[in-house]
């Protein structure tokens, strides 16, 4: 007689979870692998359309570009441009407070973003190789070793917007994050960052900076409108093994007629979303990588939560030597606005 429990196929997520994390349904333990493996796991939690064979569409091979050298004069121009204050309107601040997100046009010079895209692509290739099986490539803390990335991540212009949207006097950097959704990669699951970031504060927001125009078929970041929308689903249990949590979230938003902004991004347009803002991203159905740089800022004085979970990924690398309950002020969390440089 066959034991039917042994014949059940394991969830796709098991490929990326450690044995210890496979054996428990909760998320209380901390993540015990690197952040690329975290993304490999996390992307399995999205509800996706499948091909006729019942499998998620596999990513196409990467299209590689030669790295581009940037001279000191161009770097200085980029740094200067990213230091110019941005005139944020009262209407934009009001929308952010109401909807939990804002998309702002013409924040960054498109040519500067093209250079950044080439640089980040080179960084990802150096870090991860050219393996076509990676549907979603990521890297963090790039600002520590790349001058061009550092100008963007520590930009006074971008951090000023974050500070004014949050209504706080000063913001620090949590971390940078290169996000490359490859051709054929599926959806990013619905989530809100308060569930992810181990920061004991609501004054947290993320700038999402597309590195190319993102039409709807490329999977732009999409937002469930309403700063209080999270209340509809705050008691919904998270499932770390399959897409049921993501599927239920989408259904609840639809049943409650929550508006979803899934419009395109022009090059130079960036978004900011609050830590309580639910967001997702569609599949990349083009033949190009959908690349973005995300930088997260938090109010100066915020502390590390008492019990970080696996959903926070490899958070220790973003705030070395910071213990639960400590103020987050490591050398990797500089004050980005106001700054004295």
What is the meaning of each model-derived region?
Residues 174, 203, 217-219, 261, ...:
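Residues that flank catalytic or metal-binding motifs in active/ligand-binding sites
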Residues 191, 198-216, 264-265, 272, ...:
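Short, conserved beta-strand element in jelly-roll/cupin
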Residues 2-99, 105-190, 196-199, 236, ...:
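Non-heme Fe(II)-dependent double-stranded beta-helix
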Residues 215-235:
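Core FKBP-type peptidyl-prolyl cis-trans isomerase
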Residues 168, 183-186, 214-216, 229, ...:
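Short, charged/polar surface micro-motifs in flexible loops or helix N-caps
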Residues 2-39, 44, 229-278, 282-341:
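Conserved double-stranded beta-helix
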